[in-house]
Amino acid sequence: MKKTEMGRFNISPDEDSSSYSSNGDFNYSYPTKQAALKSHYVDVDPENQNFLLESNLGKKKYETDFHPGTTSFGMSVFNLSNAIVGSGILGLSYAMANTGIALFIILLTFVSIFSLYSVHLLLKTANEGGSLLYEQLGHKAYGLAGKLAASGSITMQNIGAMSSYLFIVKYELPLVIKALMNIEDTNGLWYLNGDYLVLLVSFVLILPLSLLRNLGYLGYTSGLSLLCMIFFLIVVICKKFQIPCPVEVALMANETVNGTFTQVALAALASNSTAADTCRPRYFIFNSQTVYAVPILTFSFVCHPAVLPIYEELKSRSRRRMMNVSKISFFAMFLMYLLAALFGYLTFYEHVESELLHTYSAIVGTDILLLVVRLAVLVAVTLTVPVVIFPIRSSVTHLLCPTKEFSWFRHSVITVTILAFTNLLVIFVPTIRDIFGFIGASAAAMLIFILPSAFYIKLVKKEPMRSVQKIGALCFLLSGVVVMIGSMGLIVLDWVHDASAGGH
């Protein structure tokens, strides 16, 4: 048995306590958005972590060590919140603008509850299946196909997360440079071109960090990312009371440098009856962009590959205790997402872009507070991308050459290839909305709906197929298939419609 598997379980009838062997080598959680786990095994080589497990490890022989867990309840809540929150928060106002307040709250509630239910399935499957690694559960349940499905979904989700982070660099870094250098005319300036800047940041800053064999700053990155998002939320709430409605007023005020529009004229425009209609919130909206709402929400709630490592580190671990951690974390993120979406929508209404932070620059320009937010978010995402690259590279390494010794050449080639591929996506994919939509409808749906329920049905033997629990898991799996196929189909139709409209 590998160290990445649990040796034995001692589950009480109420499943409130468990004792198992743990992975002494494991020092790194699968980051879905931000890395979630502040592990105290930071000196172990991450390249030796078995992200894509092989049934035969060849030369490597492991002994099973008992590790009781040392992370407090509160820190576990913090770590799981880190794993949940990510760049998806920037797209939630766009989702609300295309669903309406009431429909968005309904969808947000259902997605958060379903995500929490899938955590319940995952924890129970881990107890019964005897493994704390997502891919290994897939291997135990369905062999190589299950392992590849889990690894592929995690890799796709991480590539989507990387792409969204680099999209933020592409959108926001030119605005920061423009504000710091006080540049008015941007025509022909290469250093204000987002495509050039994302390449520059990727290969000058991100690549050297990604080539490291250890990420000692992992825990700091996690904390910084969550703090940046909290700061972002505070600014969104404050700006709601500073930006006039309709936003055309702010646009004219922003574009007028010679005082052409007086305050009286601006007030008259704001009182226009037609403009006032745009400042009335809508509760149910159905349009061609509504289809992106569910994928954006599922993308925003993916944290499941990080749940098991956090569970492993939890002091006095039990499934019930970990579920309490999950409930608090999901409820906190539910409130954070709802507030960010609501105040962003009530600030810009139908003018919300797919990346909320960029909307502020388009409407009101840049002030000191927004500049600080942009700098904080840019630093956070730049430091997080190398963290996300690690599990992708490890999965590729263990898939292509699991028994070979470490090679700097192979390590570097895989890293550069991953980074180059992600940069191509960021340069040629039109908007961050497409990343949120595609990854949310595919990989996120797999990780939240399909895989946990499929693993549960296969590995939890003590419950018959006709039991309420198994029937519920089966219905959950089928709902995930419907969400995936339905969302992907509608998104592709929207892409085709946009392409045909652009061609005319």
Swiss-Prot record:
Segments crossing the lipid bilayer: 77-96, 103-123, 159-177, 189-209, 218-238, 291-311, 328-348, 370-390, 412-432, 435-455, 471-493
Region Regulates protein turnover upon amino acid deprivation: start-end pairs: 1-96
GO biological process, one term: proline transport
Effect of C475S: Significantly decreases alanine transport activity
Effect of C279A: Does not affect cell membrane localization
Outcome recorded upon mutating N82S: Loss of amino acid transport activity. Loss of amino acid uptake activity. Reduces the amino acid affinity
Induction field: Up-regulation upon amino acid deprivation results from both increased transcription and protein stabilization. Up-regulated by TGFB1. Up-regulation by insulin and osmotic shock.
Binding-site positions, Na(+): N82, T384
Disulfide bridge partners, by residue number: C245-C279
Locations listed in the record: Cell membrane
Protein name, UniProt field: Sodium-coupled neutral amino acid symporter 2
Organism in which the protein naturally occurs: Rattus norvegicus
Gene field: Slc38a2
